[in-house]
Amino acid sequence: QLPNVVSREEELALKAIQTTYQVDDRYNAVTHSFLQSCVEIFRDAPVTLLREHYRCHPKIIEFCNQRFYNGELIAMTTDDGEKDVLQVIRTVPGNHARGHFNKREIDVITQEVLPECAESESIGIITPYRAQAEAINQAVGKDIASTVHKYQGRECDTIIMSMVDNYPTEFSDDANLLNVAISRA
């Protein structure tokens, strides 16, 4: 579960409340998801990892399993010999991002990636940033892109991930965000 996305203004307001009323940091909605707060507050409560995974192709969940779960997950899906279940497509070198928007990535998605996925039953595009999702939806003429946070709990046969940033940032390089993003397919 990902923590909330809050504006700088909301963060400052929450910080003021936390300071004024001496609220324990475990309740910090900026840095903690509800689940994280519960785990920290109820330290003696039993925690259960749901190990059986039914969503992703085994090759995709194996990446997440090794990177984020210390090999504890059990893939319950089958590998039917599909090729290229996890691909990385890089745009041309250069500084194409402008804030939370990357036109070059949108061009590559619409002109190169989506035509390759035409036979897929369901396609979703995820990105860390709302501005990028809105621009992608406008470019493709339908509502198929959303933020990683809003995609939690959803899945598609094909997921395209638009990272936007030219270089990793504290936000886009977050391990929880990457885990949720990768495991949507």
Residues of each region from the PLM?
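Conserved helicase motor core of SF1/SF2 NTP-dependent helicases
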Residues: Q1-A185
